[in-house]
Amino acid sequence: LISGNDLDLPDEDLNSEVFKNQSSIRTLADTTTFTFVNILRGETSFGTLMDSLGYPCVPSTNDPGPAGLRYFSGGYITDRHGSSDGSVISAIQVELPQPGIRDTGENWSRYASAFAKAIDIYYKFHMGKELEL
């Protein structure tokens, strides 16, 4: 999986086969028409989509890397079931802070709607499929 230190690298360094092949979105990167760095933190990245819906994310165009701060790059499930080993399922780890998302039912609901919308747009960009929401 890609570490926070790796995310702090410039696009031209990160946009390589080495980093793509160790990411949990490797298979997606092999099948989409967009560059690896674009789907990781560019205009068509999940983080940028969430950011555009009011939920700042790392990585995204506004926050491409953690800038040396603590960053959790993924756990067992993302590593085991993502596509860094070349398998067909790509995975993205999402960590949610308590304040503003998990603190009330209303915030959960608002976040869930934005999350579903971002997934729908992401699928359209990278898989050419529309979800039934």
Name each model feature, range by range.
Residues 128-133:
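Short, highly charged C-terminal tails/helix-capping segments
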